[in-house]
């Protein structure tokens, strides 16, 4: 019913209220890619860490698969800001009621920030592993290393292959 009203009144109201326009609104496009390092899609390692890069800074966390496998995270050990990491270097650990798991750097770079909220609330890793439960932020010294990581689709296929 509301659709019919909008369809009839949309052309009349659209000039006064752009939100009622029937034309699809195209969102602003931001260039994606490792060349500019403005914004990259989330990439994954075979050790279940992810990284998303914006303006040359990578945000690192663990995948949903990893947090489900770990169970309730009760403690996070993270590096100090300024720590220099090479790709695949161990940079910390997560402890859960089930197990402990080391964390590995997806890229070469320097730690610029840690998620201090995890000290008081490590369960954020479980509740919001791709948003509030991020672990560290780091510079991206070798952008070509991003190409060695898996896309989200490739990671999902990887997960299915190890589950079978």
Curated annotation (Swiss-Prot):
Keyword Transit peptide listed: yes
GO biological process: glycine decarboxylation via glycine cleavage system; protein lipoylation
Transit peptide: 1-39
Keyword Mitochondrion on entry: yes
Coiled coil stretches, renumbered: none
Xref: Gene3D superfamilies: 2.40.50.100
Keywords: Lipoyl, Mitochondrion, Transit peptide
Subcellular localization, as worded in the UniProt entry: Mitochondrion
Known cofactor(s): (R)-lipoate
Signal peptide (UniProt feature, chain positions): none
All copies of domain Lipoyl-binding, residue ranges: 57-139
N6-lipoyllysine PTM positions: 98
Record's GO cellular component terms: glycine cleavage complex; mitochondrion
InterPro entries listed in its UniProt record: 2-oxoA_DH_lipoyl-BS, Biotin_lipoyl, GCV_H, GCV_H/Fam206, GCV_H_sub, Single_hybrid_motif
Subunit and partners: The glycine cleavage system is composed of four proteins: P (GLDC), T (GCST), L (DLD) and H (GCSH). Interacts with GLDC.
Recorded family membership: Belongs to the GcvH family.
Protein's job: The glycine cleavage system catalyzes the degradation of glycine. The H protein (GCSH) shuttles the methylamine group of glycine from the P protein (GLDC) to the T protein (GCST). Has a pivotal role in the lipoylation of enzymes involved in cellular energetics such as the mitochondrial dihydrolipoyllysine-residue acetyltransferase component of pyruvate dehydrogenase complex (DLAT), and the mitochondrial dihydrolipoyllysine-residue succinyltransferase component of 2-oxoglutarate dehydrogenase complex (DLST).
Name used for this protein in its record: Glycine cleavage system H protein, mitochondrial
Native source species: Gallus gallus
């Amino acid at each position: 019913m509301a659709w019919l009203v909008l369809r009839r009144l949309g052309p009349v109201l659209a000039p006064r209220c752009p939100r009622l326009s029937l034309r699809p609104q195209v969102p602003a496009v931001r260039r994606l890619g490792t060349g500019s390092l403005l914004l990259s899609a989330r990439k994954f390692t075979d050790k279940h860490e992810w990284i998303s890069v914006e303006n040359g800074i990578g945000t690192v966390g663990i995948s949903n698969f990893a947090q489900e496998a770990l169970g309730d995270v009760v403690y996070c050990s993270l590096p100090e800001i300024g720590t220099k990491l090479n790709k695949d270097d161990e940079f910390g650990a997560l402890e859960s009621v089930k197990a402990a798991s080391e964390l590995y750097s997806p890229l070469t770079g320097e730690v610029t920030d840690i998620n201090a909220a995890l000290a008081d609330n490590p369960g954020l890793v479980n509740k919001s592993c791709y948003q509030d439960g991020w672990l560290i932020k780091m510079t991206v010294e070798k952008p070509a290393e991003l190409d060695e990581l898996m896309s989200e689709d490739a990671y999902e296929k990887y997960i299915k292959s190890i589950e079978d």
